[in-house]
Protein backbone atom coordinates (compact mmCIF):
# COMPACT_ATOMS: atom_id res chain seq x y z
CA UNK A 1 0.00 0.00 0.00
CA UNK A 2 2.84 2.37 0.89
CA UNK A 3 4.53 1.78 -2.47
CA UNK A 4 1.24 2.42 -4.30
CA UNK A 5 0.84 5.74 -2.50
CA UNK A 6 4.42 6.66 -3.34
CA UNK A 7 3.82 5.80 -7.00
CA UNK A 8 0.63 7.90 -7.14
CA UNK A 9 2.25 10.91 -5.50
CA UNK A 10 5.28 10.68 -7.77
CA UNK A 11 3.05 10.47 -10.84
CA UNK A 12 1.02 13.51 -9.75
CA UNK A 13 4.21 15.47 -9.09
CA UNK A 14 5.63 14.58 -12.52
CA UNK A 15 2.40 15.49 -14.29
CA UNK A 16 2.37 18.87 -12.54
CA UNK A 17 5.95 19.47 -13.68
CA UNK A 18 5.01 18.74 -17.31
CA UNK A 19 1.92 20.97 -17.05
CA UNK A 20 4.02 23.86 -15.72
CA UNK A 21 6.54 23.38 -18.52
CA UNK A 22 3.72 23.44 -21.10
CA UNK A 23 2.37 26.72 -19.69
CA UNK A 24 5.88 28.19 -19.72
CA UNK A 25 6.27 27.11 -23.34
CA UNK A 26 2.83 28.54 -24.11
CA UNK A 27 3.92 31.85 -22.61
CA UNK A 28 7.00 31.86 -24.86
CA UNK A 29 4.90 31.14 -27.95
CA UNK A 30 2.39 33.84 -26.91
CA UNK A 31 5.14 36.42 -26.36
CA UNK A 32 6.72 35.70 -29.73
CA UNK A 33 3.55 35.42 -31.83
CA UNK A 34 0.52 36.90 -30.08
CA UNK A 35 1.55 39.67 -27.69
CA UNK A 36 1.82 42.36 -30.38
CA UNK A 37 -1.99 42.34 -30.63
CA UNK A 38 -3.02 40.56 -27.41
CA UNK A 39 -0.68 41.83 -24.67
CA UNK A 40 -2.34 41.60 -21.28
CA UNK A 41 -5.28 39.73 -22.80
CA UNK A 42 -6.36 42.75 -24.83
CA UNK A 43 -7.04 43.04 -28.56
CA UNK A 44 -5.65 46.10 -30.36
CA UNK A 45 -7.53 45.33 -33.61
CA UNK A 46 -10.97 44.44 -32.22
CA UNK A 47 -11.08 45.81 -28.65
CA UNK A 48 -14.38 44.08 -27.84
CA UNK A 49 -12.88 40.62 -28.54
CA UNK A 50 -10.32 40.37 -25.77
CA UNK A 51 -8.82 37.26 -24.24
CA UNK A 52 -10.51 38.02 -20.92
CA UNK A 53 -12.60 35.15 -19.58
CA UNK A 54 -15.96 36.87 -20.03
CA UNK A 55 -15.19 37.71 -23.67
CA UNK A 56 -13.89 34.20 -24.37
CA UNK A 57 -17.09 32.74 -22.91
CA UNK A 58 -19.32 35.18 -24.83
CA UNK A 59 -17.58 34.25 -28.09
CA UNK A 60 -17.53 30.49 -27.38
CA UNK A 61 -13.73 30.59 -27.29
CA UNK A 62 -13.31 29.27 -23.74
CA UNK A 63 -11.82 25.87 -24.58
CA UNK A 64 -8.43 24.66 -25.75
CA UNK A 65 -10.08 23.26 -28.88
CA UNK A 66 -11.77 26.54 -29.84
CA UNK A 67 -8.65 28.64 -29.24
CA UNK A 68 -6.47 26.11 -31.07
CA UNK A 69 -8.77 26.20 -34.11
CA UNK A 70 -8.66 30.02 -34.16
CA UNK A 71 -4.87 30.08 -33.88
CA UNK A 72 -4.41 27.38 -36.52
CA UNK A 73 -6.88 28.79 -39.08
CA UNK A 74 -7.18 32.48 -38.27
CA UNK A 75 -10.43 34.41 -38.59
CA UNK A 76 -11.37 37.92 -39.68
CA UNK A 77 -8.38 40.18 -38.92
CA UNK A 78 -6.44 37.44 -37.11
CA UNK A 79 -3.99 35.63 -39.37
CA UNK A 80 -3.45 31.89 -39.39
CA UNK A 81 -0.54 30.57 -37.36
CA UNK A 82 -0.52 27.17 -39.05
CA UNK A 83 3.29 27.30 -39.15
CA UNK A 84 3.23 26.54 -35.41
CA UNK A 85 3.23 22.89 -34.42
CA UNK A 86 0.13 21.30 -32.91
CA UNK A 87 1.99 21.13 -29.61
CA UNK A 88 2.87 24.84 -29.77
CA UNK A 89 -0.75 25.73 -30.51
CA UNK A 90 -2.06 23.56 -27.67
CA UNK A 91 0.46 25.07 -25.25
CA UNK A 92 -0.47 28.64 -26.19
CA UNK A 93 -4.19 27.82 -25.94
CA UNK A 94 -3.66 26.38 -22.44
CA UNK A 95 -1.64 29.46 -21.51
CA UNK A 96 -4.38 31.83 -22.75
CA UNK A 97 -7.05 29.95 -20.76
CA UNK A 98 -4.90 29.88 -17.63
CA UNK A 99 -4.23 33.61 -17.89
CA UNK A 100 -7.90 34.36 -18.56
CA UNK A 101 -8.89 32.43 -15.43
CA UNK A 102 -6.33 34.44 -13.43
CA UNK A 103 -7.69 37.71 -14.85
CA UNK A 104 -4.57 38.40 -16.90
UniProtKB/Swiss-Prot annotation:
The keyword Transcription does not apply. It is found in: Plastid, Chloroplast thylakoid lumen. GO terms for biological process: photosynthesis. Residues 1-20 form the signal peptide. Binds 1 heme c group covalently per subunit. GO terms for molecular function: electron transfer activity; heme binding; iron ion binding. Belongs to the cytochrome c family. PetJ subfamily. Keywords: Chloroplast, Electron transport, Heme, Iron, Metal-binding, Photosynthesis, Plastid, Signal, Thylakoid, Transport. This is Cytochrome c6. InterPro entries: Cyt_c-like_dom, Cyt_c-like_dom_sf, Cyt_C6, Cyt_C_IC. NCBIfam families: Cytc6PetJCyano. Monomer. Pfam families: Cytochrome_CBB3. It comes from the Eukaryota. Heme c binds at residues 34, 37-38, 78. Functions as an electron carrier between membrane-bound cytochrome b6-f and photosystem I in oxygenic photosynthesis. One of its GO terms (cellular component) is chloroplast thylakoid lumen.
